[in-house]
């Protein structure tokens, strides 16, 4: 991941944690969609007001089966959620900041991305136990960064004719999940 992306992510974290952390409730989360894609992930929702929470999550997939088949992906997400009822229950809308670095290859097809994305999202928290919730969510936004797509995407720009480098802004899904949420407090 480039140094610029790391610095911007640290700034986002510092701004997000500037809010009052006298949380009444904290919840640990894992995204079952990413788990199904064999991408380990963990997150935390911190309630900062009666109907507001901040969320942080990360996922990492370091898998390389061969030179032709691999998935190397690292994603960090920080977000703010406004709950229409009590925090961690029922409907919410939110904003997300995402930092992603991925390198995927499946046979002759592959791509490498590094981007920062900002987006809006919606979700609903279903209570399935005393301290357990199931939260389907979706978010869309814009990504700012660079991509390399093509057969030999690992070859540096200028050294390989089959790699196509693009820079700019593109629409992305910033959050897609079926999250299992365990409320600690």
Residue ranges and their predicted role:
Residues 1-26, 180, 184:
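Bacterial Sec-dependent N-terminal signal peptides
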Residues 80-83, 170-185:
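Outer-membrane beta-barrel "beta-signal"
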Residues 34, 45-48, 170:
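Short secondary-structure boundary/capping segments within folded domains
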Residues 31, 58-71, 101-115, 144-154, ...:
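Extracellular/periplasm-exposed beta-strand and loop segments of Gram-negative cell-envelope proteins
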Residues 25-39:
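Short N-terminal segments immediately surrounding and downstream of signal-peptide cleavage
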């Amino acid at each position: 991941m480039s140094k610029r992306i790391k610095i911007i992510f640290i700034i986002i974290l510092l701004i997000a944690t500037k809010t009052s952390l006298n949380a009444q409730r904290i919840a640990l989360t894992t995204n079952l969609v990413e788990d199904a894609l064999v991408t380990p992930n963990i997150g935390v929702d911190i309630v900062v007001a009666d109907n507001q929470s901040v969320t942080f999550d990360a996922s990492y997939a370091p898998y390389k089966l061969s030179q032709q088949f691999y998935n190397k992906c690292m994603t960090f997400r920080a977000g703010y959620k406004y709950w229409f009822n009590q925090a961690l229950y029922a409907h919410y809308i939110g904003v997300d900041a995402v930092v992603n670095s991925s390198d995927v290859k499946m046979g002759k097809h592959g791509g490498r991305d590094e981007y920062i994305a900002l987006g809006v999202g919606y979700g609903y928290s279903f209570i399935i136990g005393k301290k357990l919730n199931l939260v389907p969510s979706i978010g869309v936004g814009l990504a700012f960064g660079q991509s390399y797509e093509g057969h030999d995407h690992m070859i540096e720009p200028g050294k390989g004719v089959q790699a196509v480098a693009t820079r700019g802004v593109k629409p992305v899904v910033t959050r897609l999940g079926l999250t299992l949420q365990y409320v600690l407090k």
